[in-house]
A protein has these predicted regions:
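Active-site environment of non-heme Fe oxygenases that use a 2-His-1-carboxylate facial triad
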Residues: 1-19, 34-36, 82-224, 229, ...
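N-terminal auxiliary "cap/dimerization" subdomain that precedes the catalytic jelly-roll/cupin core
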Residues: 1-69, 222, 227
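Long, hydrophobic, well-ordered secondary-structure blocks that form the structural core
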Residues: 49-97, 101-103, 120
Length: 240
């Protein structure tokens, strides 16, 4: 029903919130919109046979719809993306590659839809070493002021995507913008910008180096059944 009847996604969200007398939605929305936090993890105390992929899709759907309306995912053709990271992979991006870091980035850099926040859920894990989740808050980043104040970061960059994303257009937007209070926000991923000149190319290299060398990254093992929910304007995420 969740796949074919969109209104049931709100029904399941309300059912979850009703279990907490609407306190869950209030708490999650206060965290996700607060610049000093903007991110949280949620998961079960114990994994049982009932916490399977079907349950986790339902739970993630409910959480997402208590915060907003998810963007359509063109890669999978659904209201959510689901993929496997495998031992062998021949795809055209880092997303499914087990033995490559996925550098710090934000989501939605190459689509027209606005991406305010994201939810990532680990449904299953077998025969795995490493693969930790990496996170970085923009206000904790040592190089933020330097790069934010560089005028190149405010230029429009061209952003494309590989064929697997099923997006047949390109977009233009700057790497850095600001919120209503004038604080930095970022929209960036290393794989998809198409620099138009030396100035933009060198700026992106400085940006990439500065993010990956940050001493303030949070690197944590995300257990099976757990989700990370993050504000997409000032939290970057990756995989190590």
């Amino acid at each position: 029903a969740l796949e074919l009847r969109p209104f049931t996604r709100f029904t399941i969200a309300k059912s979850l919130d009703d279990l907490t007398n609407n306190k869950l939605s209030e708490l999650m929305n206060s965290i996700i919109r607060d610049r000093s936090t903007g991110c949280f993890m949620i998961g079960p105390k114990n994994i049982t046979s009932k916490i399977n992929d079907t349950f986790l899709v339902k739970l993630s759907t409910a959480i997402a719809h208590l915060i907003g309306v998810p963007n359509h995912d063109a890669m999978t053709g659904k209201y959510y993306a689901r993929f496997q990271v495998k031992h062998e992979d021949s795809s055209d991006s880092y997303l499914r590659k087990a033995y490559r870091n996925m550098d710090l980035h934000t989501d939605g850099t190459y689509v027209k839809e606005v991406t305010d926040w994201l939810i990532m859920t680990k449904i299953d894990e077998q025969n795995v070493e490493g693969g930790e989740t990496a996170m970085l808050h923009l206000d904790d980043w040592e190089h933020c002021d330097d790069l934010y104040e560089d005028p190149v970061g405010k230029q429009n960059f061209v952003w494309g995507s590989p064929k697997s994303k099923n997006i047949d257009y390109k977009v233009e937007h700057p790497v850095f913008s600001s919120d209503k209070e004038g604080r930095p926000t970022i929209s960036y991923i290393d794989q998809f910008p198409e620099p138009q000149n030396m100035e933009q190319g060198n700026f992106l290299q400085r940006l990439s180096d500065g993010l990956e060398e940050s001493k303030n990254k949070i690197v944590t093992k995300l257990p099976v059944g757990y989700s990370v929910i993050a504000n997409n304007y000032f939290w970057l995420h990756g995989r190590k």
